[in-house]
Amino acid sequence: MQGGTPEAVKLGRWSRDFYLGQRAEIGTDSGFTRQGYLLPCFSEAEVAAAHDRIAMQQAEGIPVRWAGPDEVSELNPTMAPGVTLGASYCAEDGYITPPRNVAAYTAALLGTGVHVAERTAFTGLDGTDVRTSRGTISAGLVILTGGPKLAAVGALAGIRIPAGGARHQVAVTEVHPAFADTPMVFHLPAGLYWRPEEGGLLFGMSNPDEPPGEDRSVDEPYLAQMRARLAKLVPLTADLRLRRVWAATIDFTPDHLPIIGPALDRDRVFVASAGGAGMMWGPAVARATADVALTGASEITDVSMLGLDRFDESGRSRLAADPIALPFPEKTT
């Protein structure tokens, strides 16, 4: 819930509440683990920015607070003592299990009679008729999604969408009992985060110099660089083997904010993008887009500023970028 703007905070809070009540609502859950979330600071400028964010987040009703260096060590004993100047902390935050999340949604869709068309390519739109590799689907309303492929999806529909994708790497260490009850941590300046996973520690990283693209090979030199950085912060990891390492394509928008709203100059066609925060904002972005498509507005937050009309012809946004984001490329292509 520790977003960098009021809109991001509201999207994050709604998504967290959805995860908490997901089983009661749709009969499946995404394995949400409420274990807290730390954003450590390493400079006085970061401390000042954190206090400003905390004030904004508290005004939005989020139970976030400042934790000094000693308390950070208490909250996460695996971190090197005295390595930070403190951190923003919210005990109500947590994380989900991505594979379980996908399985949960799929089961819920199938259980309500939705036909999931796998291995079916989208090829374009005729009004709200959806052309696919298996024929045309007549629809009264269309919502375009696609994650890192969203710009390509938009191009097939004749719609310019400033969204991109870049390589993101994740690794999981071997098991160590010290990680079991530790909160998730996001080292914002380094684009490095970590949390417990299957008895070990999962850590993910995005290279700020990574160009947009679909490279899903593991960048071994950058992985080594991030492992060295992680070892300074979490010394236990220095001697732990890696059980799994993979790379994937993560989506992003130029201002690190979601896209929610109608396609420009199209009737009954809408666009939804979580802007690189799919697990944190995904449920709220989906609901808000559905709300806008059906009623013109959403009770989650005012999304009128999050539409495609905030971007100019070059894809530049008139909004300030959300400061709580991975270091995505400056341009989408």
What are these regions (language model features)?
Residues M1-L75, G191-L192, P211, R229-A231:
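Dinucleotide-binding Rossmann-like beta1-alpha1 core, especially the glycine-rich loop
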Residues V83, S88-L141:
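Helical element adjacent to the flavin cofactor pocket in flavoenzyme catalytic cores
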Residues A231-T333:
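C-terminal catalytic lobe of FAD-dependent flavoproteins
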Residues T136-D181:
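Central helical "cap/lid" subdomain
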Residues G68-P69, E118-T120, R244:
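Short loop/edge segments at beta-strand edges and connector loops
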Residues T33-Y37, A166-R167, V245:
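Short Gly/Ser/Thr- and Asp/Glu-enriched loop/turn motifs at secondary-structure junctions
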Residues K10, C41-A49, Y89-A107, S217-A224, ...:
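Short beta-strand to alpha-helix junction loop
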Residues V175-R268:
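Active-site lid/adjacent beta-loop-alpha segment flanking the redox-cofactor pocket in flavoenzymes
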